[in-house]
């Protein structure tokens, strides 16, 4: 009973040991298989590297030769070396040839750039210690604007290309050029180009920095970038808006002198190219000449305080010694870089003080000595953009309205000289409108100290309008009667007049206690038309009229005769000594029967003869005096009126002719001047 379990245990332990041995053999066999797989993977990687870089391996794969020949024992009977070579050959043949060639080119370029930049110092210019490096520049202008007269600036978008030769970057290979990325740009030398008159210029960085570098086999480097340049443009607005502005662009090296770097325009391409689709809203780009300049800079030494003599109480006069000789016509921009000093050309080469040698100067604490033995010269390039302004906008907004206002002011010459209110209001309205128009025209201009061509035209128009008001003042000064109304003289009636005659006068004419009264009646009421010839019924009716109505009818006829004399200018009547009363004559004419045409004609002739004044001076005066005396005696109203002013008649011709003549001289002078400027456009270096 007790041994059986022991026997079973022994047999059980024997089975366990057998299983353990089998498990160990299985695990070792699996380990060998995994090692074999790893070894195969390494061999495959080596073959792949050999296919990718065949030139880097001096040996080739062949059956039973080469470093990749493996013995049969090492691969546990899985094949021989000939089979391994066939596997490598099949892998290399399965890859595309174009991909392999491109991979080889990339590898060659990377290796070439590494070799070129190995030991390259980008802080040293090309040919250091030898001749100066030549920088060739050309510009491609894509767009221009805005151009501001107030700030005197202009902006443009351009491709700024620079080219120079750096022999350290020369190479040999199948490719003629190498295009470098932006990251490689920081590893090579570049000129420190800056814009002399630049303001807020920047490089475009969307979507990536817009610049690239290209290297040629001979070591030439082409560096191109897209810039938006905002530069200053000193404008002369004397001919505005018929002006031609010259906006310069100056650039050069900031730190390298002419002994290190020289700037030149590219001879293979035009210095400044303009895009064909470029348009400006207010200007036309007529020309863009380019030239070379040399910027001569004089370095200023530090101020040295002067010692005061012990026995001299007066402080010494501070001086500034200037001894300089110009070196050719190219040396035009002479200044002290980094300071506010302005060199006096009159003191150059004379050895005298820059202050003129007389008088004392306050505000200087010492002397400033200019080191003129070795002035620094900087190479500089400049291009002038000649911009001709469009005049269409100003013709519509300024010139046209000014001319219309001047013509409108001439309407007062055709108004009556008595229409004071109308002529004055018209003149003041045109003056105020002209003032507003002149102020509005200068809103887009800087506050310059000199008048422009537009200001001259505005002043001219304002002067003509103001002269119109002065002309009316002179006309009004010589106006004898009225200021828009018709005046009549009324006197008290004689005491001998009857009540029937005084009653209508006092009721109609608003009599007063004064001996003479001036009553004002509008001109519209002074226009009285000729009544038709009286009929038989009318004559019968007129007999029954009251004396007041008859008197009003006689007054109307008399007033009509005075106005018709001015209009028709009929000859005077032959009998100037006729003293018959108008009322009696009219009554007789009304009472006489008009049965025949001869009687009617005789009556009309007599009436015309009575109302026509004489033309002679003496007869005219006697006629006026007689009419006035008759009016005073009978209480009638005598109208007083003025003739058309001779000044108005002359102004209708003189003012338009003078305005046209001045305009001809104005436009001819300014337009011909602009044409001469275009014809005699100087070079950019002047």
Swiss-Prot record:
Compartments, record wording: Postsynaptic cell membrane; Cell membrane
Disulfide bonds: 233-247
Record keywords: Cell membrane, Chloride, Chloride channel, Disulfide bond, Glycoprotein, Ion channel, Ion transport, Ligand-gated ion channel, Membrane, Postsynaptic cell membrane, Receptor, Signal, Synapse, Transmembrane, Transmembrane helix, Transport
Composition-biased stretches (Low complexity): 597-609
Signal peptide stretch: 1-58
Record InterPro entries: GABAA/Glycine_rcpt (IPR006028), Neur_chan_lig-bd (IPR006202), Neur_chan_lig-bd_sf (IPR036734), Neur_channel (IPR006201), Neuro-gated_channel_TM_sf (IPR036719), Neuro_actylchol_rec (IPR038050), Neurotrans-gated_channel_TM (IPR006029), Neurotransmitter_ion_chnl_CS (IPR018000)
Segments for region (Disordered): 570-641
Any one Gene Ontology BP term: chloride transmembrane transport
Sequence ranges of Polar residues compositional bias: 586-596
Alphabetical list of Gene3D superfamilies matching this protein: Neurotransmitter-gated ion-channel ligand-binding domain, Neurotransmitter-gated ion-channel transmembrane domain
Spans through the membrane: 394-414, 424-441, 456-476, 651-671
Primary localization class, coarse: membrane
PANTHER family attached to this UniProt entry: NEUROTRANSMITTER GATED ION CHANNEL (PTHR18945)
Protein name, UniProt field: Gamma-aminobutyric acid receptor alpha-like
Species name: Drosophila melanogaster
């Amino acid at each position: 009973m007790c041994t059986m379990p022991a026997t079973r245990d022994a047999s059980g332990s024997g089975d366990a040991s057998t299983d353990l041995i089998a498990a160990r053999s299985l695990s070792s066999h699996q380990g060998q298989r995994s090692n074999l797989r790893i070894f195969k993977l390494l061999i495959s990687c080596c073959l792949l590297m050999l296919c990718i870089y065949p030139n880097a391996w001096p040996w080739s794969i062949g059956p039973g030769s080469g470093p990749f020949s493996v013995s049969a024992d090492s691969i546990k009977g899985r094949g021989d070396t000939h089979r391994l070579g066939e596997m490598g050959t099949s892998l290399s043949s399965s890859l595309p040839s174009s991909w392999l060639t491109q991979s080889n080119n990339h590898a060659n370029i990377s290796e070439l750039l590494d070799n070129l930049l190995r030991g390259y110092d980008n802080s040293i210019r090309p040919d250091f210690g030898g001749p100066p490096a030549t920088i060739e520049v050309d510009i491609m202008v894509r767009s221009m604007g805005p151009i501001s007269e107030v700030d005197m600036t202009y902006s443009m978008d351009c491709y700024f290309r620079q080219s120079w030769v750096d022999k350290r970057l020369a190479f040999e290979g199948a490719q003629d050029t190498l295009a470098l990325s932006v990251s490689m740009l920081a590893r090579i030398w570049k000129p420190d180009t800056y814009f002399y008159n630049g303001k807020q210029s920047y490089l475009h960085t969307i979507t990536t920095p817009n610049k690239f570098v290209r290297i040629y086999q001979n070591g030439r480097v082409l560096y191109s970038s897209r810039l938006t340049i905002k530069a200053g443009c000193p404008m002369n607005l004397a001919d505005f808006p018929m002006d031609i502005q010259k906006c310069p662009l100056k650039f050069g090296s900031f730190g390298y002198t002419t002994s290190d770097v020289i700037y030149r325009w590219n001879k293979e391409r035009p210095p400044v190219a303009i895009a064909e689709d470029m348009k400006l809203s207010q200007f036309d780009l007529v020309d863009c000449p380019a030239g070379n300049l040399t910027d001569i800079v004089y370095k200023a030494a530090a101020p040295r305080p002067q010692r005061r003599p012990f026995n001299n109480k007066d402080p010494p006069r501070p001086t500034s010694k200037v001894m300089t000789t110009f070196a050719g016509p190219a040396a035009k921009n002479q200044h002290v870089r980094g300071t506010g000093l302005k060199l006096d050309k009159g003191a150059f080469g004379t050895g005298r003080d820059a202050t003129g040698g007389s008088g004392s100067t306050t505000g200087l604490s010492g002397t400033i000595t200019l080191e003129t033995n070795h002035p620094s010269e900087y190479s500089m390039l400049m291009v002038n953009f000649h911009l001709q302004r469009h005049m269409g906008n100003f013709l519509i907004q300024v010139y046209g309205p000014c001319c219309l206002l001047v013509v409108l002011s001439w309407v007062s010459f055709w108004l009556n000289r008595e229409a004071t209110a109308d002529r004055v209001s018209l003149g003041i309205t045109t003056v105020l409108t002209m003032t507003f128009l002149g102020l509005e025209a200068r809103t887009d201009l800087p506050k310059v100290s000199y008048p422009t061509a537009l200001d001259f035209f505005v002043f001219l128009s304002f002067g003509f309008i103001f002269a119109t008001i002065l002309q009316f003042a002179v006309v009004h000064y010589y106006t004898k009667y009225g200021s828009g109304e018709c005046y009549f003289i009324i006197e008290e009636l004689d005491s001998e007049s009857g009540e029937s005659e005084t009653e209508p006068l006092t009721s109609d004419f608003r009599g007063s206690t004064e001996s003479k009264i001036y009553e004002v009646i509008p001109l519209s009421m002074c226009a009285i038309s000729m009544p038709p010839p009286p009929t038989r019924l009318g004559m019968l009716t007129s007999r029954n009229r009251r004396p007041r109505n008859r008197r009003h009818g006689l007054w109307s006829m008399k007033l009509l005769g005075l106005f018709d004399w001015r209009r028709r200018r009929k000859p005077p009547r032959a009998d100037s000594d006729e003293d018959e009363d108008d009322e009696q004559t009219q009554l007789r004419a009304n009472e006489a029967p008009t049965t025949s045409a001869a009687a009617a004609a005789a009556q009309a002739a007599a009436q015309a003869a009575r109302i026509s004044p004489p033309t002679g001076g003496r007869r005219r005066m006697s006629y006026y005096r007689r009419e006035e005396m008759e009016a005073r005696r009978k209480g009638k109203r005598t109208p007083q009126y003025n003739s058309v002013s001779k000044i108005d008649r002359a102004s209708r011709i003189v003012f338009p002719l003078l305005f046209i003549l001045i305009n001809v001289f104005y436009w001819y002078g300014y337009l011909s001047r602009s044409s001469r400027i275009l014809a005699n456009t100087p070079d950019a270096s002047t």
